[in-house]
Amino acid sequence: MTVRHSLSEELNRQGNEHFSRGYYTEAYTCYAKALEYDRLTGDQRALVATLGNLGNICAVSGRRDAAQANYQEVLELQKVLGDEKGIGTTLANLGNLRADAGEWGRARAYYLE
């Protein structure tokens, strides 16, 4: 395991801790730093986790467009990695995002995909 990968994991752990306490700005900062490291290392699995966390923080913060973009990137990576369980979770996240926006048809399409 590389130092950068360990740093990414630690930043995501800290971000999750902040998120669970409702400190969304601090959580976002941790996830954004982790994303920098993940992109540098090219670790796709770490990138999936970090982008998913960023999508979640954007979703609860009302930043639907950013959440959508993060989840879409996660979905593409999960398809490349063959992560069927992860794909299901991400499609549900995308569906929930659209349902929260009142876009029932789009939400349904994600849920059924």
What does each of the following model-derived ranges do?
Residues S6-S20, T29, R45-V60, K85-D100:
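Conserved alpha-helical positions within TPR/SEL1-like repeat arrays
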Residues M1-T2, R39-D43, L77-D83, D100:
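Short coil/turn linkers that connect adjacent helices within long alpha-helical scaffolds
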Residues C30-A46:
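Short, charge-rich amphipathic alpha-helical segments embedded
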Residues G102-E113:
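Short, intrinsically disordered, charge-balanced linker/junction segments flanking boundaries
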